[in-house]
């Protein structure tokens, strides 16, 4: 089975939704309320990272499936999909930033800026969902 089998894509989409619900459940309304090293910030960061990672994995698999080459980075997967017209340019650009956010979280490149975390958690989920919709709606039916 590939990530483009309907059952696998549906399962991964449901996993993304579960993570995004947990982000929404724990995300304080204001950035000032999101404090580092709290249960809320830990839950928001962990679940946003996990949802983003699933989408990244699907983007990488889509590049290979569509013969767009092997992305050199996670961000490159979204750039390739944008350049091929699979994902529209503005969405691809936002997903490139999501991949960068994922790297900061996963590799602790820098101290996490809670404003950036709050912004990503409040504004990023529609982009992750949008990408999943692209996979469902734009790829050929036999591949979706």
Outline where the language-model segments fall.
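Solvent-exposed interaction patches of small proteins and small membrane subunits
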Residues: 1-144
């Amino acid at each position: 089975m590939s990530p483009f089998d309907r059952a696998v894509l549906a399962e991964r989409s449901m996993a993304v939704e579960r993570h995004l619900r947990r982000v929404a459940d724990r995300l304080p309304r204001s950035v000032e309320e999101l404090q580092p090293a709290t249960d809320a910030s830990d839950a928001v960061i962990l679940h946003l990272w996990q949802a983003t990672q699933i989408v990244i994995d699907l983007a990488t698999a889509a590049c290979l499936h569509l013969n767009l080459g092997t992305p050199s980075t996670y961000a490159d997967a979204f750039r390739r999909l944008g350049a091929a017209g699979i994902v529209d340019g503005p969405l691809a650009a936002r997903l490139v930033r999501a991949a960068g956010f994922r790297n900061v979280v996963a590799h602790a490149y820098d101290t996490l800026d809670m404003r950036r975390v709050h912004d990503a958690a409040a504004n990023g989920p529609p982009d992750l969902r949008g990408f999943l919709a692209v996979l469902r709606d734009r790829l050929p039916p036999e591949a979706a």
